[in-house]
Amino acid sequence: PRVLWKNSEFKAYLVMLTAATALITWNLMDGMDFSGTQAFRYAAFQVASISSTTGFVSNDFDVWPSFSKLLIILLMFIGGCAGSTSGGIKVTRFVLLFKMVYSLVWQKLHPQMLAHVKMNGQEMPENVLYSVARFFFVYIMLCVLWAFLMICDGVPALAAIGVSVSTMG
C-alpha cells in the first residue's frame, strides 16, 4: 500500500476519478434533480466504467447535462493507467505531459535553472518526453480530424467529439 501512495500515476488517477465523480454528482443533483445518493451512484459507476473503457452503462448519460457529458468525454480521452487494456492516452502520458509543461514554464521564469522532469523519483530522458508530446499531438489531431469530418456530415458537435474520442480510445 505505501508503494502505491508514492506512485505519481496512481495518485493522479485517484485524484482524477474522485474529482470527476464529485463534479458529476454535483452536476446531476443540480441539473437532473437526482437525490445525492442516486447522483453519486450513477456518477461513480459511469466514471469507473468510462475511465476503464469497459462500456457498461447504469443510466443514459446522453440525457445528462452538458458539463457531465464533457467530463465523461475527457475521461474517455485520458483512459486508464499504463499497462491496462483500457483505451485513451493513459494517465502516465498525461502526468508526464503536465510535468513537462510545468518544467518548461518554470524554466522560462528562471532561465538560469535546470529543470528536470521526474516520474516516481526517476529523471525522464528528453527523448521520452518528446515522444509523449508527439503522441499527444497526433492523438489530438486525429480526434479533431474525425470530429470535424463528422460535423461536416451533420453530426452535432458534442456527439461528434464523443464518437471521435471513443473510437480513438
PLM segments and residue spans:
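Membrane-proximal intracellular helices of multi-pass ion channels
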Residues: P1-G169
